[in-house]
Amino acid sequence: MMEAIHINYVLEQMDLAGKYRQRVRLKAWKKDGNEVDYTGWVPLTGHWRGGIHRLMNPVNGEVRAVIDVLIYEFNGHSVYL
C-alpha cells in the first residue's frame, strides 16, 4: 500500500474528479461495518457540511452516498482523519 493521506486531501481530490468526471478507486465501510469497494465509480457531488459524497457507477448509472469519515482507502492510499 502507498503512503497514507489525510481525509481533507481525499475530499479535494474527489471534488476535482467529479468536476472532470474521472473515475476513482475508493473503499469505505458501511454503517453496519461491511466493506464496500467503489472501484471505477465517478464522484457526482459532495456536501462538506453534511459529510457525504455521492458516487455514480458509470456502467449502470446506480448512485450511492458515501459517508466521508468512513472512507479508509482512496486510489491505493490508506486514509487517516
Label the model's feature ranges.
Residues 43-45, 65-80:
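Structured surface patches comprising rigid loops and adjacent beta-strands/short helices at the edges
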Residues 26, 53-58:
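SH3/SH3-like beta-barrel fold
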Residues 1-14, 36-41:
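Charged, amphipathic alpha-helical segments
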Residues 36-38, 44-51:
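Acidic, low-complexity, intrinsically disordered interaction modules
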Residues 30, 57, 73:
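Acidic surface patches and DE-rich sequence motifs
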Residues 23-25, 39-41, 68:
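Conserved beta-strand residues within beta-sheet cores
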Residues 19-30:
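A short, Trp-centered hydrophobic/proline-enriched beta-strand micro-motif
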